[in-house]
Every structure is written in C-alpha cells, then in structure tokens.
Amino acid sequence: MSSFLQVPRERWVASNALAFALRDTHPVSPGHTLVIPHRLVATWFEATPEEQRALFALVDEVRRELDGSHQPDGYNVGFNVGEAAGQTVFHLHVHVIPRYRGDMEDPRGGVRHVIPAKGNYLLGR
C-alpha cells in the first residue's frame, strides 16, 4: 500500500478521474505540490498514456492555482525514476516546484543541479 493512497481527500488540492494532487510534506519551496495517479504504479514508464495525460492535466491545474496563490517566478516540474535517480517512494509522483527569484544563488541549469558539478554548464564558457 502506498502512503499517498492513505492521505485523506481533504488534503488534496486538485483531482481528476485518474490522479490527485497534494502539497509535499517536505517542500523544497512554498507551494511544492505532488501530482499522483490513483493507481499504484512505480514510475512514469509504467503509467498508461491516459494516466500520463491526466497527470499533466493536473500539473497545469496546479500551476494555475499556484500562479494565483503563490505568484512564483518559475517552476521545476519532474519525477524521479529508480533509486539511482533519487526515487524513495515507489508510487509515481510528479513534483511541481515553484521557484522564486533569489531562492538559490545561480539557478542556471535548472534540473541539471541534481548532479551539482553539472548544474551550471555555462560556467566554463
């Protein structure tokens, strides 16, 4: 059983027939939200095309809500697949991470910072 499936519906911030969204309990930034399929699948690659579409529809809905409630300056959106990529909960979830000017010294490179030395590939130019 997935811990996500035990979260009460009152904590959901959005949902559709195939997925739901809730705020991350260990947020990277204010508004950090997880979008999760109702069906327990470990990774994006195990989700059906319909589930993938439903997840991205909720990513859009969450982004619109966060634009109004948190006014971020940008977003990182993504998921981890496998332990080597940092996955610790083996129920697919898409991170919607609002980003704010000044939340890190130099954000260039975005998701490339998962390997810190590779983050800002422009530094050597």
Give names to the regions the model predicted:
Residues M1-R125:
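HIT superfamily nucleotide-processing domains
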